[in-house]
Curated annotation (Swiss-Prot):
It is an enzyme of class 5 (isomerase). Signal peptide: none annotated. InterPro entries: PsdUridine_synth_cat_dom_sf, PsdUridine_synth_TruA, PsdUridine_synth_TruA_a/b_dom, PsdUridine_synth_TruA_C, TruA/RsuA/RluB/E/F_N. Its EC number is 5.4.99.12. Homodimer. Substrate binds at residue 111. This is tRNA pseudouridine synthase A. It catalyses: uridine(38/39/40) in tRNA = pseudouridine(38/39/40) in tRNA. GO terms for molecular function: RNA binding; tRNA pseudouridine(38-40) synthase activity.
Length: 258
């Protein structure tokens, strides 16, 4: 068997998430269906580095899969790309070692979250940015977001009832930019891993700080108390993008560890 690694992007609007599940359209199911056609009708299982939720998008999701024989990687990419549905794009395919695992090999993820703060909202962005109709002071959020950087126990920012025992993660970079021409806030988080709904909960909390309904110090309070009830609401999934995944063997990996 030959193992392949692929970078994919997708519009999550019409998907019930990445991971295969019964009676739902998922990214995994669509790619596996296409690979089956390219593999003489034989099943191919793909593995994903991130299990994005319903409505969540990706520019830089990474998958891996095995095929019984070596293929020209560009022909394989082209075949997959042209036969997958229009809301999935196969960006790159490369052959990798048999022990490569897209989820368990050491890597760094970057997520982006888009928030439309226009009043009225932009209907063209309804599937691609979460609308926040209340006034915000961007400088308050930019100050508060600094407290998320570093190694912390993020229990207070994960979904209640999660089965993951170790909730310590490291965020290397966290920032907020404002694209005035589109009334868009762009939240960017880079870290060694993220808990279930962590990014959406951090954004929901920061928006509440920006609106003046929580103090700037609330991030520190939540991290210390490890209490989800102290955080803001979970922001909707339509604004979330898995932007990039960088593995340890890639040249730019060390830039984030400094």
């Amino acid at each position: 068997m030959t193992r392949y690694k692929a970078q994919i992007s997708y519009d999550g609007s019409a998907f019930s998430g990445f991971q295969r599940q019964p009676n739902c359209r998922t990214v995994q199911e669509e790619i596996e269906r296409t690979l089956k056609r390219l593999n003489s009708g034989n099943d191919v299982i793909i593995h994903g580095a991130g299990r994005t939720d319903v409505g969540v998008h990706a520019y830089g999701q990474v998958i891996h899969f095995d095929l019984p024989q070596a293929r020209d990687v560009e022909k394989l990419r082209f075949g997959l790309d042209t036969q997958c549905p229009d809301d999935i794009d196969i960006v790159k395919v490369e052959q990798v070692s048999d022990d490569f695992h897209c989820r368990y090999d050491k890597h760094i993820k970057t997520y982006e979250f888009l928030v439309d703060i226009g009043r009225p909202k932009n209907p063209m962005m309804r599937n691609y940015a979460t609308h926040y109709p209340y006034p915000v002071i961007i400088e308050l959020m930019q100050e508060a977001i600094k407290d998320l950087v570093g190694t912390h126990d993020f229990t207070g920012f994960t979904a209640s009832g999660t089965s993951v025992e170790n909730k310590v993660r490291t965020i290397f970079d966290a920032k907020i930019q404002f694209e005035a021409s589109k009334n868009l806030l762009i939240f960017t988080f880079t870290g060694n891993g993220f808990l279930y709904k962590q990014v959406r909960n951090m954004v929901g909390t920061l928006l509440k700080i920006g609106n003046g309904r929580m103090p700037i110090s609330q991030i520190k309070t939540i991290l210390q108390a490890k209490n989800r009830d102290l955080a803001g609401p979970t922001a909707a999934g339509n604004g979330l993008y898995l932007k990039e995944i960088i593995y340890e063997d890639e040249e730019c990996f060390s830039n984030f560890r400094k």
